[in-house]
Amino acid sequence: LNAAEALVRWDHPTLGSIPPGDFIGLAEETGLIGPIGEFVLRQACWQACEWQRQGLEPIRVSVNLSVHQLRQGKLVSLVRQVLEESGLEPRYLELELTESQLLDSVEHIISTFQQLRELGVKLAIDDFGTGYSSLSYLKRFPVDYVKIDQAFIRGLGEGTEDAAITQAIIAM
């Protein structure tokens, strides 16, 4: 095990566990995405440090971002504060933004990502292949990882067109 991803679920009293795809849009519309995102970031960093305190090897913990969190302009200071408070080394934190979200506020995202990289945080583009970005567009973003969408990965062993596309991306 070399990495883990923090995933939030809404534990609804009557509907049970609700996946993020079913409530993140509402959280963004109502302004709750900021507090939810901060909670997830804090919990992920704390848990990664807790595992280290228990004697486990350090692992990278990944947290998904919403473009709304980036727009607020407080993300870099929040990440810096959480890293200091938790004691997690920045290299063990990875922040992810989906490819489709990169199309919004491009220059602001690039600037924020550059500042986060200066802190030592790892950055990733998630769900690559689901948006309409060209590779020349994506290379503008200072990221450490590009995570290919699982829809492409599923067809890898079957000789499908998805497999050909995925292999071409990996070869680059």
Task: List PLM regions with ranges.
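Conserved long alpha-helical elements within nucleotide-processing catalytic cores of c-di-GMP signaling
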Residues: 18-25, 34, 110, 114, ...
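Flexible loop/coil segments at beta-strand boundaries within sensory signal-transduction domains
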Residues: 13-15, 54, 115
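Active-site core of bacterial EAL-family cyclic-dinucleotide phosphodiesterase domains
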Residues: 1-26, 64, 96, 125
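The catalytic core of metal-dependent phosphodiesterases that act on cyclic dinucleotides
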Residues: 3, 7, 80-156, 170-172
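Catalytic core of bacterial c-di-GMP phosphodiesterases, primarily the EAL and HD-GYP domains
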Residues: 1-5, 30-108
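Catalytic-site-adjacent helices and loops of nucleotide signaling machinery
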Residues: 16-20, 29, 125-138, 162
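Catalytic strand-loop-helix junctions within cyclic-nucleotide turnover domains
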Residues: 11-15, 69-71, 156-157
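Cyclic nucleotide signaling catalytic output domains
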Residues: 22, 26, 43, 62-67, ...
